[in-house]
Amino acid sequence: MQDNILGRRSLMSGLGAATAALALGSKTASAQTPARPFQPARHSQDAWLNAVPGTHRNFIDASTPNGAGEGMLYANNLYVANKSGYSLNESDVAVVVCLRHFATAFAFNDTIWAKYGKLMSTMLQFTDPKTKEAPSTNLLNSADYGMALPNLGNTIESVVKRGTQFAVCDMATHFFAAQIAMAAGG
């Protein structure tokens, strides 16, 4: 009798497993509906991004004085790397460097730096590495600093000549303008 019970249990377990296998295996696997490709929101303020030439698009975000310098270095590196790695021309590579937060001041020209360099130097905690004083020019426009700055001599002008475009933070620009106005008594 004991052998009969074990035999029936074994038979029932086997039939249960076989039934489950048939039920699961006989169903045709259906793939999920593919997700729609990502489509970013479009705003008229961003239309200029559609006009940026080049099929290999890169966006570099810089938010600090060091980051601004590194942005110039990285932009140059993208042109060099895409030329050597993919045989791409500079016109095939689209680079946008965004200067925001404390990197925004490096979007300002030498006239602004000459007049407000001391104030900006204090706000940014950034000094000329040669003089240890507040800069009176935009140091990212000079190739004379070499390894002393994170751009390693790659200037704003040199990456612009290669095709780099810049996005500059509106909020940070207004912040700097307000700080300069307050310091000037306005």
Describe these PLM feature segments.
Residues M1-A18:
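N-terminal secretory signal peptides and thylakoid transit peptides that target proteins
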Residues G25-T55:
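C-terminal segment of N-terminal export signals and the immediately downstream linker at the start
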Residues L88-I112:
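Acidic helix-start/capping segments at beta-turn-to-alpha-helix junctions
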Residues P65-G67, H101-F106, F166, M171-F176:
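Solvent-exposed loop/turn segments at secondary-structure junctions
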